[in-house]
């Protein structure tokens, strides 16, 4: 899928409020009023739901772009992965089970998760997921600011009925969950990388570790 997308697919169809800060030019790269560099991979989900309907199960990944200031955990270009499941009788329990399975398969059986309430316009309810720090096993260390928890790992929630409706799916019959994660951030947690900029600096000695 192209890196450019319609403003409508990136925001309007995903139930983003008209005054949501992510719509601002300070957050999103605009070509013109209708075309932007995608700030998330969610427009792929919109296209898939509109073209294929429900039931649907999908994973998509790719580069996304946001007008972020560069620091140890932020980059104006990064990689995102999203998952979407829409079917009859899909519940929050299905979402939690799926993500717990992923975390334990990827980071290890000993890693615990914490689901916190959050707000995303395209899901309701919405949650953020943390994991116990992989450096100290949750005991508390400098890497996790002595909290025992790693940085926010991913966002997720039940697909908002308005999003289903916007994509031609009946929310009275179908429900679904979605999750999204920064691939670079996942790699940082797994491989104990302290600065996201290291991934984009073409440092051969660093890259050869992988």
PLM feature segments, named:
Residues 4-210:
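TRNA-recognition modules of translation machinery and tRNA-sensing kinases, especially anticodon-binding
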């Amino acid at each position: 899928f192209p890196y450019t997308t319609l403003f409508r697919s990136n925001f309007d169809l995903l139930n983003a409020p008209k005054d949501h800060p992510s719509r601002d030019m300070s957050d999103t790269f605009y070509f013109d009023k209708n075309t932007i560099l995608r700030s998330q991979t969610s427009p792929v989900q919109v296209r898939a739901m509109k073209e294929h309907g429900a039931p649907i199960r999908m994973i998509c990944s790719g580069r996304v772009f946001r007008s972020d200031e560069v620091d140890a955990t932020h980059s104006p270009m990064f990689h995102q992965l999203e998952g979407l499941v829409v079917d009859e009788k899909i519940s929050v329990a299905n979402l939690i089970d799926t993500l717990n399975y992923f975390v334990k398969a990827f980071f290890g059986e000993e890693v615990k998760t914490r689901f916190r309430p959050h707000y995303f316009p395209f899901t309701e309810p919405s949650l953020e997921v943390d994991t116990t720090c992989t450096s100290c096993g949750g005991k508390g260390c400098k890497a996790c600011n002595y909290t025992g928890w790693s940085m926010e790992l991913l966002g997720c929630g039940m697909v908002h009925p308005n999003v289903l409706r916007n994509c031609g799916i009946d929310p009275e019959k179908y429900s679904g969950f979605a999750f999204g994660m920064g691939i670079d951030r996942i790699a940082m947690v797994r491989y104990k990388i302290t600065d996201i900029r290291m991934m984009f600096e073409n440092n051969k000695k660093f890259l050869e570790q992988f």
